[in-house]
Amino acid sequence: MKIVVLHQSRTGNTKRAAELIGGAVQSAGAEVAVRPISNIDYKELADADLVFIGTWVDGLILLGQRPGDAGKIKRVPKLWNKKVVAFMTHALNPGNAAEKMTSLLEEHGATVVAARSLNRHKLELEAPAFVNEVLSLVSV
């Protein structure tokens, strides 16, 4: 199985989550590439069986959370018929940011198979557990 993990990170938390996801995927026996959204390898993306795309949760708790830097996510090539996993990182309450990320990716042609926001203080625990959950759901 070929998996690509793309991330958009402002402070390094989402990059760290992407690296942990990539490590867990590799430990499960898949071929994996981890890249920032600004450095996409289009052939890798086209050949991928599964794509993880991540960013951070932006916004204030009372004013509505949303995917951070959504404009850069929209620049990812269309993901028609690609199985995609959305992930985000947050500090406090992610609200419904994962659902908003799912909608953004589905509007971009993706088939979103899972979405989760990971607490930036618990990445080492939450990221591998999320990968195990996703891989148990996905057959390619």
Model-derived features with residue positions:
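Extreme N-terminal starter segment of soluble prokaryotic enzymes
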Residues: 1-4
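Short hydrophobic segments within beta-strands
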Residues: 6-8, 87
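FMN-binding flavodoxin-like domain, especially the glycine-rich phosphate-binding loop
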Residues: 13-16, 22-37, 44-140
